Amino acid sequence: MGQPGRPEFPDRAARRPGGPADVGSLVVDDSPALCAALDAGLGASLCLVADNAGAELLADLALVDHLLATGRSERVALHVKPYPYFVSDALASDVAECLAVLGEGPRGRLLRAAAEGRWTLRTHDYYRAPGWYRDAPGDLVAEWAAASLTVFKGDLNYRRLVGDAHWPALTPFADVVGYFPGPVAALRTLKCEVVVGLAPGTLAALDASGEDWRVSGVHGLLQVAGL
């Protein structure tokens, strides 16, 4: 049984079709550390950097509602793009559309949280600019630094976070994002060659599988640093 108020998840070792037999859907799974940090209050002031609109953004809003309703977060800032990199990128207008189709309960709670200043919607021109987050302007860095935890979602945000370089896959995630001004988490589906923080056994199994695992969209990861 899980803790009260915490949603139950399927077996984290569940396999995905097309993946190597001894590697699960997540090639890195730091969710136990992330959940423990949230339970310990690290998400009190959380910055969530969104990725896609549509169903994914609805899930993001459900997460924000859950974090606020359970007290795992006192304040959540949802960061979206001012203009899309890709047609699917979440914008402020998408948040409004998602709120309109949410059930009365979560919609009402989120609107009250917004009125009380516990949930804010933020954007910044740098989210649509070419460049790495290491080189982000000072006012955006200050927003990340003010958060007790920043969560980046999506493949593009991951590439910008780690610098989109040809890192050896065994390079520790914490080393690559050591510049970041506070605790950070990254969630993404692998759709490009860039990946860090793999365990040696995981990398060996993936490379031996013959699968084009870095870009196939079959695998994902959840990584944390600075918790």
Predicted feature residues:
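Electropositive, gly/pro-rich neighborhoods at or near active sites that engage anionic ligands
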Residues: 1-47, 53-59
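N-terminal beta1-alpha1-beta2 submodule of the flavodoxin-like/Rossmannoid cofactor-binding fold
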Residues: 68, 81-84
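Residues at the starts of beta-strands that form the adenosine-phosphate
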Residues: 45, 73-77, 183
